Every structure is written in C-alpha cells, then in structure tokens.
Amino acid sequence: MTQEILSALDGEVFAVWFLIGAALVFWMQAGFAMCESGFTRAKNAGNIIMKNLMDFWIGTVMWFIIGASLMLGDNVMNGFAGGISFDVFTNYKNFDYSAFVFNLVFCATTATIVSGAMAERTKFSSYCVYSAVISAIIYPIEAHWTWGGGFLAQWGFHDYAGSNCIHMVGGICALIGAWMLGPRIGKFERDGSGKVKKVNAFPGHNLVIAALGVFILWLGWYGFNGAAATDVPTLGSVFLTTTVAPAVATVVCLIFTWAKYGKPDVSMCLNASLAGLVAITAPCDVTDCFGAAIIGAVSGLLVVFGIWFNDYKAHVDDPVGAVAVHMLNGIWGTIAVGLFATSTAPGFAVAGIDEGLFYGGGFTQLIKQLGGIGVTALWTVVTITITFFIIKKTIGLRVSEEEEIVGLDSTEHGLPSAYSGFAIMDISNTMDVNENTNLGEADYDKASEAKRNASVHVENMSETLQGTVMQTGINKVVIITKLSMYDKIKKALNDLGVTGITVTQVTGCGIQKGSSQMYRGVEMDMTLLPKIKLEVVVSQIPVDRVIETAKKTLYTGKIGDGKIFVYPVSKVVKIRTGEEDFAALQDVE
C-alpha cells in the first residue's frame, strides 16, 4: 500500500514538473526577444520585440486550430501526420491539456528562431504569415514523425528535446529566409563585377540585454530538456549534461576567439553558450558527462565557423547568428546521439535505442540519426521555400530601402524610439561603427533619395520653426563633414557664390584607423576621423541650392558622409556699420 502511494505521488510530482517545464520554455520567449534585440540596432528593437510576441500569439491560434492535431493526433498516411481532430473543442473533458500546452511552447520556439536571422529588413505582415505557416503545418508534421508516434519514432530515431525537430528546423527556415531576403543595406561591399570585397560589421546596440537573454534562455533550457524526465536520476543527469555542454562550448569559444582575433569576443561567446545548449538537446538523456563535454567543445568551434562561413563564403546576412547556433548545432547534436549514447546514462533504457559509435554500439544508431536529419531537412527546405516564395511574389518579404534605413520601429510600428526618454534612435543612425558603411551606390545622381539622406542627412529647422520665429529670408547653414572633404566643399560653395564661411575643426574621438577591432569575426571600422564644421549665412542664394550642392559634393555612397543643419536667422547686425539683415550681408555672401 505504501509503495502504491509513493508511486502515485511520484507520478503527480512529475506531472506538475512537466507543466513547470512548459512554463520555463514559455519564459524562453523573453530570452529570445532580449538576445535578438540586443544583437541588432536600436532603431529596430521594438520591431524585434513585437515579432517575438507574435510568434506565441499567432502560434497559439494556429496550434489549437490545426497544429496540435497534426502533431498529437492518431497516425494517418503511415505515420506521416496526425489525423485532424477538434477534441479540444468537442471532447474537452477528456482532453490531454498538459501535452497541448507543452508542445505549444515548443512550437513557438521553432518559429521564433527565424526572426533573428531575418531581422532589420523583413515586413511585419510577411513575418506574421510565415510564422503562422511554421506553427500550423511545418513544425507539427515533422514533430509528429519523432514525438507523435510517426515513422521516425517507429524506426528508432532519437531526439529527446529538439535539436532536430526544433532547432535544425528553425535554423533551416532562418537560412532560407535570410538568403531569399538578401543582406541588410551596406552589409557587403561589392566591386564592379558584383564580387564581395568587404564584409561590414553591424554591432548590436546592447550586449547587456543580449547577455540577459542568454541567461534567461539557459534557465529555460532546464525545462526545455528536463521537463519530459519521469524519474529523478534521469532528471539529474539531464540537468548535468545541459550544464556541462554549454559551459565547455563557451570556454572553447573564448580560447579560440582570443587566439584568433587577439581578444575574447563577447557576442561570439554568448552565441557559443546557446550553441552548446542546442547541441546537447537531442542527446541530453542518453549521454554522460564526457560525451556532453565533447559535444560542447565541438559546438564552441562550430558556431564560430558557421558565423564566419555565412559572412565570408555564403554571404548570408544573419544578424544574430541563428543559422550557426540552431541549424549547424541542431544537426551536430542530433548526430551526437549516434556517437555518444551510452547505457550508463539513466535515460538510455527508456529511450530504447542503440549505443553510440564511440561507446561500442557501431553505426546502427548513427545511420538512424542521419536518416532522420535528412528526411526532416528535406521537408523543411521544400515547405519553407514554397512559403517564402509565395509571400515574396504576393505581399513581399522585404521592407523598402527607405524604411530599412530609417528603422522598422518607426516605419512599421510608428514608434519614434523603443527607448522613450533616451536619444538612442537618433544616436543609432550616427554611431561610429555605422559610419563609412557602404550604401551600394557611389553615384549621387543614381542614388535613391533614401540613400542620399542616409549619406548626407539634412535637418531644416527653418521649415520646422516656420511661423514661430521672425522670418527674414536669411538662413544659417551648418555643415559637418570629414576633414578630408574641406577643400572640395569649400570650392563647391565658392563656385556657388557663397564666400563667407566660418570653419571649425571638431575634435574626433574613437579608435584610430589601423587598429584591429573585431566583432563576431568581422573587422570593424571604428574610426571617427577628424571632422570640420562649416557655417555660412545665406540670403540671396536660395538655401535649397546650398543644400543640394553640399549633398552632391559630400556624397560618396557611405553612411555618415556629412550632416547639414539649416536654421532661420531672425536678425543680423554688422557691428562696424550698424547695418542689419540683408544689408549687413552684402560683402559677406
């Protein structure tokens, strides 16, 4: 009798833990939001947060309508999918509420992986559509193959918590999406033949927030990997491997980036922690501490290689490293089951699989793992490519050039800034690291208005203050540009007829050119060259001609070529003669 009571209590405890684990996985959405927003620029932070929210909102709706039954329903078509049912509406009394919620939060994780790789240039409406497709069709069907009693489960394929079903699938969607979408403006500089000659770094605006996101994700991962455990030894072992793998991955990445780039790369190490977590997700129940350490070590190197390969070989712009973290390490973690599965792990007996190659089990399990990866990858590539293609040909995937340059917070959501009360939005557009970023068109006459404005920004206070100050028709034009442009702009203004120019050299700050600074393996141009400020007061020459002349002269096709400020002048007095306004300027202009 006592044993029966203890068994019943044990079952109830793990049933509660199962739901606590689901809550921890839900909390991971906050981690993804923090990571992605921290790794991207401030002008898109609100957009990133909104997309991470929509993953769960849209995913929940899609899940109870169709996704849950496709994954959890009885096998149809020889285990290809679950049968469509509406038990959540028609048979609620006998419905498996816990399984519904637990698998829902996993589904949301798959969808949210994609947003980081496609950040800063994707239409919000398009994002909502493909997020819905992933949650309704792509994830539920392939997850059924492994976790819903489908053909992969029957074959002996093993993915305990989602290296394959969640992370590889999300990573493949991210890769194809980023590739079809194209890079952010200025990420890659190309020569006349179209060959990439330089890769530019776009550092995230807040690594502190990104680090917080990593810690939130790591905490959530204990639920992600551990929630399905049904006994204490297995749960303890899962917690151990889930701790060891990311720790080793981060240390290996630290050492490698320190040796390769001269300094340990903060953002790369943050990615390495996540890479180790992704890789250990599939084998966490069937491997031991040694296996977890090796899996983590490979992850720490794989994430660095993946980010480098995307930047320098594939030329796929992935702002947060989602492809390297999730796709590559999802594949590696799934393969690792066939290498490091051992009968000494508490969860091995429950898994019902063969031991790994390195533990005397031969190639049997490894072949099953490779087969599962291949089938799942093929399904994902085909379905997400069709999805993105249809979206691209209908509502479009990418925002306009002007919207991208201004920032999606403003253009997609009407937010002047995600940081109300702080001038981060304005600062982000003129950050040192963004200066000299190529806009893709060096000819002023061929450049779009958005590129012209990004290169030489104009703030016309005469128009803004019209009606609030005395209008004399006199304007002060202030031009801030690089010191090297002085002779060129001086001659252009002189040819225009502007001769009275006040010039001030502005003290630059930052790291001098030639210093080797790296961000995620990409060399940064941290230089803020000495600048000059030119001030002219014009009355007879139309101010628009002065602005246009300055813009055309300063434009080189890169962000930060110059800034122009125009202020209305309410009174001018020549001290020597007492002349005022127009008369005071006759021998100056």
Name what the model sees in each region.
Residues 2-465:
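Glycine- and aromatic-enriched membrane alpha-helices
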